[in-house]
């Protein structure tokens, strides 16, 4: 293992030891940086989206810019104040961009979809073309990756083009494991990176990642796009083309010079637009990369349906309604059976040396739902 590859692995380890149940988010962010692409993390407040992004940025000796976006955020706050001297001496509107987004190499915009129309066009030019129109001059922007965080997906049409420029999307959920919740309490408040890399080292990593051979997986990639199309999920040519680089970078992150079928799993975080499409996209991809995870998706769909059934039960009056009580017992029994099936699938995956990250995630979701139902019954 080369020195820079060793550094990358150390960064990955440090992040995973502090940010519990965030392995996928960390891999997505690092892949995004290697690919010179952008990532948006979605999720409820308090799931450490912002803290994780800051921590990842702290491992890179780069110009960093961060801003919380509101409906009232001005161009001055993002792109720099107007130069009074230029205005007085030359009658030109020029911004002093040093220390602001146009000079950043790594950037983070919190509540990113609250950006107003007055700054959207400039943001699009920066993240897509890496240029900023400063008065009558065009400035090159050294941006490597822009990270966004939001509690929700954008709904306004004018934001959709902006959302599309984030190649990677990930819904971040709260910690589910009781064991990890105990660990969380004991963690230091402040994350302190031990391993850092320079921009020069990062560029070297990017060069090496670009050399990864993808010949063996091209056919599978085309097949995934075709199957998603059959499921009415549209992948633009631009997004499809960019996904190739993402696969290369993900393979490199995993220490490979040739992309393997499992590297296609990074596409789970690229090929969806609506949250409702995540399961379909994952199912199509896992059907090719990991049959065990694909089996788990069927169980995840059943769990989703059982959760929906729970919505029609009046929890407050459960002790007074025998029908609702019996329904709750039925759901609990089904969940117990699903958990046994999931454990069986997980054991088979381990025997066959396949990844179990996604399986573990669904098992945790099952346990969480089971505990919720048992809590209701225990209160009766």
From Swiss-Prot:
Annotated SMART domains: AAA
GO MF assignments: ATP binding; ATP hydrolysis activity
Lineage of producing organism: Archaea, Methanobacteriati, Methanobacteriota, Methanomada group, Methanococci
Signal peptide limits: none
Annotated protein name in UniProt: Uncharacterized protein MJ0079
């Amino acid at each position: 293992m080369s020195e820079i590859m060793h550094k990358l692995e150390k960064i990955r380890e440090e992040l995973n030891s502090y940010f519990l149940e965030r392995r996928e988010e960390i891999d997505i962010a690092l892949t995004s940086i290697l690919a010179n692409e952008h990532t948006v993390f979605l999720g409820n407040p308090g799931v450490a989206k912002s803290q994780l992004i800051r921590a990842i940025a702290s491992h890179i000796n780069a110009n960093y810019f961060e801003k919380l976006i509101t409906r009232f955020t001005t161009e001055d706050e993002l792109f720099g104040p107007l130069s009074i001297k230029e205005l007085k001496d030359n009658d030109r509107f020029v911004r002093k961009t040093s220390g602001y987004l146009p000079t950043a190499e790594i950037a983070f915009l919190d509540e990113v979809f609250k950006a107003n129309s007055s700054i959207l066009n400039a943001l699009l030019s920066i993240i897509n073309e890496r240029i900023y129109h400063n008065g009558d001059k065009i400035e090159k922007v050294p941006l490597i990756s822009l990270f966004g965080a939001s509690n929700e997906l954008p709904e306004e049409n004018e934001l959709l083009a902006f959302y599309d420029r984030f190649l990677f999307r990930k819904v971040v959920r709260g910690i589910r494991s009781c064991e990890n919740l105990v660990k969380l309490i004991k963690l230091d408040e402040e994350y302190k990176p031990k391993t850092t890399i320079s921009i020069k080292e990062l560029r070297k990593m990017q060069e090496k990642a670009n050399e990864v051979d993808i010949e063996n997986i091209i056919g599978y990639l085309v097949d995934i796009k075709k199957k998603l199309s059959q499921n009415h999920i549209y992948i633009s040519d631009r997004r499809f083309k960019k996904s190739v680089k993402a696969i290369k970078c993900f393979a490199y992150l995993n220490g490979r010079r040739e992309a393997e079928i499992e590297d296609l799993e990074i596409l789970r975080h690229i090929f969806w637009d609506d949250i409702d499409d995540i399961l379909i996209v994952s199912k199509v991809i896992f059907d090719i990369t990991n049959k065990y995870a694909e089996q788990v998706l069927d169980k995840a769909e059943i769990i989703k349906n059982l959760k929906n059934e729970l919505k029609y039960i009046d929890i407050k009056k459960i002790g007074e309604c025998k029908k609702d009580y019996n329904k709750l017992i039925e759901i609990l029994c089904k969940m117990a059976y699903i958990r046994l099936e999931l454990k069986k699938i997980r054991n088979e995956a381990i025997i066959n040396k396949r990844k179990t990250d996604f399986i573990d995630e669904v098992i945790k979701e099952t346990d969480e739902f089971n505990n919720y139902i048992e809590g209701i019954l225990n209160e009766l």
